[in-house]
């Protein structure tokens, strides 16, 4: 089996907290130097690289003398502010040794949820790559709140891969890849060498939380691969402890778990809707509506809605959940939650009678709907 990275030109590399902070003992300058050297080698092969690096909060904790990750958001933000300084300085110093300029970019979910800011971020990143700069991206932990957090840098890495239309996402972690079961508990667990990024059984294999330093467990990495596949990007999950792992992947060596994007690439606007707009509520739809959305490419009509949950306004994103509780689609609603509660289970011809007006015959038009 040949590594999918060998034929990939534009890469997003995500490095976890434990790999850049030596399991929380402060920034590991030697390890960061090795990442810089490997990325320089990839650049010499003509590959473009964007680096998503965790470590700001962990470095801030070390500088502040904290042994446990705080739970209060203001303390997390303070740690991020302290740690981000050191993280940026070390990366700049190490890449300069190879004659490479770096750029620091801090993002929040709100930056990508706004279409204009999303396009500006994309333009900036593509310009930096054209100029030969390595962008180093992290979540802007000093200003985020629970409502606008990405949640983890695995998710951020996938969204960046979509943003720049990357060929592949490489998630480097302290684990060898995805196993069929937890290898710490099951001696028969085996490494998954390659799989479809959208395969539902992967999520069951990946259950469990991450380390106390970071926020991402294996499940977040599987979900990140699924997101990256929206833009056609493949994903590799591999151990960052492997010597020269990036160089070896680029040379064609299969390391870790390869998750292949086998779904059709989404149109740019639908990709943005699926990945960057926050879901404000959801509707439960019947089996017939599920069939029409997934197989027929139809719009969602009010008559197919069984239940309405959450508070949302017209034009916001809502999720469409089947009778089994599984999300099948999401899209921009033509009616608020209050209006939807009045018209659900009713044919479109009765909307005006119930509400006194009809904005649209569909709850979600197919042009504003994305299958997930």
UniProtKB/Swiss-Prot annotation:
Keywords of the record: Amino-acid biosynthesis, ATP-binding, Cytoplasm, Kinase, Nucleotide-binding, Proline biosynthesis, Transferase
PROSITE patterns documented for this protein: GLUTAMATE_5_KINASE (PS00902), PUA (PS50890)
SMART domains per UniProt: PUA
Its EC number(s): 2.7.2.11
Subcellular location per the Swiss-Prot or TrEMBL entry: Cytoplasm
TM segment ranges: none
Gene Ontology terms: biological process: L-proline biosynthetic process
Positions with a binding annotation for ATP: 14, 173-174
Domain PUA: 280-358
Transmembrane helix as UniProt keyword: no
Catalytic activity entry: L-glutamate + ATP = L-glutamyl 5-phosphate + ADP
Gene Ontology terms for molecular function: ATP binding; glutamate 5-kinase activity; RNA binding
Pathway in which the depicted protein is active: Amino-acid biosynthesis; L-proline biosynthesis; L-glutamate 5-semialdehyde from L-glutamate: step 1/2
One Pfam family linked to the record: AA_kinase
InterPro entries on file: AceGlu_kinase-like_sf, Asp/Glu/Uridylate_kinase, G5K_ProB, Glu/AcGlu_kinase, Glu_5kinase, Glu_5kinase/COase_Synthase, Glutamate_5-kinase_CS, PUA
Residues binding substrate, per UniProt: 54, 141, 153
Database matches in PANTHER family: GLUTAMATE 5-KINASE, ISOPENTENYL PHOSPHATE KINASE
HAMAP family attached to this UniProt entry: ProB
Summary of the function given for this chain in its UniProt record: Catalyzes the transfer of a phosphate group to glutamate to form L-glutamate 5-phosphate.
Protein name from the UniProt record: Glutamate 5-kinase
Organism this protein belongs to: Burkholderia cenocepacia (strain HI2424)
Lineage: Bacteria, Pseudomonadati, Pseudomonadota, Betaproteobacteria, Burkholderiales
Gene this protein is translated from: proB
């Amino acid at each position: 089996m040949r590594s999918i990275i060998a034929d990939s030109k534009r890469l997003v590399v995500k490095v976890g907290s434990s790999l850049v902070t030596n399991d929380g003992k402060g920034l590991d300058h030697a390890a960061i130097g090795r990442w810089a050297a490997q990325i320089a080698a990839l650049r010499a092969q003509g590959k473009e690289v964007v680096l998503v690096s965790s470590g700001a909060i962990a470095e801030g904790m070390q500088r502040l003398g904290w042994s446990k990750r705080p739970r209060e958001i203001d303390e997390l933000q303070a740690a991020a502010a302290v740690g981000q300084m050191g993280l940026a300085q070390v990366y700049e110093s190490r890449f300069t040794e190879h004659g490479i300029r770096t750029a620091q970019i801090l993002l929040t979910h709100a930056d990508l949820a706004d279409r204009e800011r999303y396009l500006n971020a994309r333009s900036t990143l593509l310009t930096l790559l054209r100029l030969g700069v390595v962008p180093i991206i992290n979540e802007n932990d000093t200003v985020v709140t629970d409502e606008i957090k990405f949640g983890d840098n695995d998710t951020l890495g996938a969204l960046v891969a979509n943003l720049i239309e990357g060929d592949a996402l490489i998630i480097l972690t302290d684990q060898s890849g995805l196993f069929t079961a937890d290898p710490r508990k099951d001696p028969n667990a085996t490494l998954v060498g390659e799989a479809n990024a959208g395969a539902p059984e992967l999520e069951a294999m990946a259950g469990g939380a991450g380390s106390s330093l970071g926020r991402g467990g294996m499940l977040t990495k599987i979900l990140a691969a699924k997101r990256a596949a929206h833009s056609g990007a493949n994903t590799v999950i591999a151990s960052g402890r492997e010597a020269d792992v990036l160089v070896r992947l680029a040379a064609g060596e299969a390391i870790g778990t390869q998750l292949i994007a086998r779904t059709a690439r989404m149109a740019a606007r639908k990709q943005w809707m699926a990945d960057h707009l926050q879901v404000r509520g959801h509707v439960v739809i019947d089996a017939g509506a599920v069939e029409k959305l997934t197989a027929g490419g139809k719009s969602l009509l009010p008559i197919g809605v069984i239940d309405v949950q959450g508070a949302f306004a017209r034009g916001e994103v809502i999720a469409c959940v089947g009778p089994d509780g599984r999300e099948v689609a999401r899209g921009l609603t033509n009616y608020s939650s209050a209006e939807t509660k009045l018209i659900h289970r009713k044919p479109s011809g009765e909307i005006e009678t119930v509400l006194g007006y009809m904005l649209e015959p569909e709850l979600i038009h197919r042009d504003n709907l994305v299958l997930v």
